[in-house]
């Protein structure tokens, strides 16, 4: 059976931690920044964990857990 291909667009947006959690970066931080406070912009810099309902779908896109 051939190897499964990693979807490169997903590999750029998500990464898998050592414990297996899938992390994503938050949106809304690069457009219309003038209207947002510094505190809100700092919160957008933090990584978030992917929701459980989306986890299985993302695992199919990055089968080898690309970091």
Swiss-Prot record:
One of its GO terms (molecular function) is structural constituent of ribosome. It comes from the Bacteria. GO terms for cellular component: cytosolic large ribosomal subunit. One of its GO terms (biological process) is translation. The keyword Flavoprotein does not apply. Keywords: Ribonucleoprotein, Ribosomal protein. The keyword Ribonucleoprotein applies. InterPro entries: Ribosomal_bL35 (IPR001706), Ribosomal_bL35-like (IPR021137), Ribosomal_bL35_sf (IPR037229). PANTHER family: 54S RIBOSOMAL PROTEIN BL35M (PTHR33343), LARGE RIBOSOMAL SUBUNIT PROTEIN BL35M (PTHR33343:SF1). Belongs to the bacterial ribosomal protein bL35 family. This is Large ribosomal subunit protein bL35. It comes from Dehalococcoides mccartyi (strain ATCC BAA-2100 / JCM 16839 / KCTC 5957 / BAV1).
């Amino acid at each position: 059976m051939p190897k499964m291909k990693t979807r490169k667009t997903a590999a750029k947006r998500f990464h898998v931690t050592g414990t297996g959690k899938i992390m994503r970066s938050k949106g809304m931080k690069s457009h219309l920044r003038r209207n947002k406070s510094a505190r809100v912009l700092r919160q957008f810099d933090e990584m978030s964990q992917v929701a459980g309902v989306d986890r299985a779908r993302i695992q199919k896109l990055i089968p080898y857990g690309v970091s």
